[in-house]
From Swiss-Prot:
GO terms for cellular component: cytosolic small ribosomal subunit. HAMAP family: Ribosomal_uS5_B (MF_01307_B). The gene is rpsE. Keywords: Ribonucleoprotein, Ribosomal protein, RNA-binding, rRNA-binding. With S4 and S12 plays an important role in translational accuracy. Part of the 30S ribosomal subunit. Contacts proteins S4 and S8. The keyword ATP-binding does not apply. This is Small ribosomal subunit protein uS5. Residues 12-75 form the S5 DRBM domain. Transmembrane segments: none annotated. One of its GO terms (biological process) is translation. The N-terminal domain interacts with the head of the 30S subunit; the C-terminal domain interacts with the body and contacts protein S4. The interaction surface between S4 and S5 is involved in control of translational fidelity. Belongs to the universal ribosomal protein uS5 family. Signal peptide: none annotated.
Length: 167
């Protein structure tokens, strides 16, 4: 039931990662509803994800997109790749990402690829360990991307210059 879709809306890239049918059992039978997992990004270091649930698929997607737009975070990129190798985890999912040379492309699978593409990461090597549940992979990927620190951020935190750190 998982599918991907990309739509341009006010310069944000939107991707639908997964649609799932779920049911609630009540006295009279089952009540079916749908969940949608989406990510949005500006392709330049801002990314967010949303998880929506409704009785109809379009409504679930709409809710997920709204939540994704409201939960956007900014990440530090280095000319389309990461500054340094980084790990992230959420629940049973663990992800590892490392910078890659120009022309490598996004080496990632499924949900992680969607997050990296909308975030504006063009060259990266990545691997998912443990659970490959799309929601947990998305959360772990964003957790890892938030941990990326640019040399300027590290220098400011240490009270040094960028040149002093790179030695």
């Amino acid at each position: 039931m998982a599918k991907e879709q990309q739509v341009q809306a006010n310069d944000l890239q939107e991707k639908l990662i997964a649609v799932n049918r779920v049911s609630k059992t009540v006295k009279g039978g089952r009540i079916m509803s749908f969940t949608a997992l989406t990510v949005v990004g500006d392709g330049n270091g801002r990314v967010g994800f949303g998880y929506g649930k409704a009785r109809e698929v379009p409504a679930a997607i709409q809710k997920a997109m709204e939540k994704a737009r409201r939960s956007m975070v900014t990440i530090a990129l280095n000319e389309g790749t990461l500054h340094h190798p980084v790990k992230g985890r959420h629940s049973g999912s663990k992800v590892y990402m490392q910078p890659a040379a120009e022309g490598t492309g996004v080496i990632a699978g499924g949900a992680m690829r969607a997050v990296l593409e909308v975030a504006g990461v063009h060259n990266v090597l990545s691997k998912a360990y443990g659970s490959t549940n799309p929601i947990n992979i998305v959360r772990a990927t964003i957790d890892a991307l938030v941990d990326v620190k640019s040399p300027e951020m590290v220098a400011a935190k240490r009270g040094l210059t960028v040149e002093a750190i790179s030695e």
